[in-house]
Amino acid sequence: MAGRLHPRFGDRLVLRQANFRELATVAPGAGFARVDGALFDLGLSRYQLADSKRGFGFRAGGPLDMRFDPDRGVPAVELLATLAAAELAALFRRYGDEPRASRIARAVVDARRTAPVSTAEDLAARGERGGPPNPRQPRRTHPATRVFQALRIAVNEELDALAEGLAAALDLLRPGGRLVVLSY
């Protein structure tokens, strides 16, 4: 999609694939000291979710990596294999707002005693075994959705990267410039 935009805008549009936290170096490297606007798209693409080698979604399955850049950071499988139940529960609560965080974390730790929780299917099953969701709330999503979100945010240090990127974007904006953040 991005490639289709370039002919329309020519040299007024510069696209770079990088982490938000790299904006302070990427923009000057592309010749920008000041900009009129910046766009941050915080969403996952359906291609990332469907890629079974990445482990972003439980529907696609595959190994639990969850890194946006497979050459950086610690994959989700390592966090699941090494963090204590209390640390996992805190992670699920902080980044996923998961009300069953402690039960799911215990299910992960119990399961890894016999075999590693190494695939999206394994983690989805732990999410389901963490106990039923609140019966008074309608169930619109898979029980492991918030756990997957929490792990992805932790693996990619998304909140820290976003904070650094937003600060850099504000420094780059000309007076009257616009910063647009897409989040859904």
How should each PLM-predicted stretch be described?
Residues 1-184:
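S-adenosyl-L-methionine-dependent methyltransferase catalytic core, i.e., the SAM/SAH-binding region
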